[in-house]
Amino acid sequence: MWDPLLNEFPDSVHGLRCMLAIKYLQLVEETYEPNTLGHDLIRDLISVIRARDYAEANRRYTNFNARLEGSSKTELRQPVYQPCCCPHCPRHQASIMDLQAHVSKAADVQNVQKP
């Protein structure tokens, strides 16, 4: 965890609040499995807090809120079955058989060269 006595403080109170909120959300994120809707929503909320300008933060929050309102509490811990294209999603790094998702399985072929 972040130690306030060993690290620099942000320049503003707002920066400190954002930093503490992100640290808290990272701890909450660890309670969700990586392939669940709850994990995706926590990552989206962290990206809302990290947005640099108001318009971008507002756009991200609107998208986050629509996803949150459209899901029930029971869906938050359920695996997500729909494909997504977010860059932080751990589902894109591995599949069921510990193969990377973008790597196709190679097939053995017989030697077809003429002797």
Swiss-Prot record:
The keyword Secreted does not apply. It is found in: Host cytoplasm, Host perinuclear region. It holds the Pfam family Gemini_V2. Its main location: host cell. Keywords: Host cytoplasm, Host-virus interaction, Inhibition of host innate immune response by virus, Suppressor of RNA silencing, Viral immunoevasion. InterPro entries: Gemini_V2, WCCH. One of its GO terms (cellular component) is host cell perinuclear region of cytoplasm. The keyword Cytoplasm does not apply. It comes from the Viruses. GO terms for biological process: negative regulation of gene silencing by regulatory ncRNA; symbiont-mediated suppression of host innate immune response. Belongs to the geminiviridae protein AV2/V2 family. Interacts with host SGS3. Through its interaction with host SGS3, acts as a suppressor of RNA-mediated gene silencing, also known as post-transcriptional gene silencing (PTGS), a mechanism of plant viral defense that limits the accumulation of viral RNAs. This is Protein V2. It comes from Tomato yellow leaf curl Sardinia virus (TYLCSV).
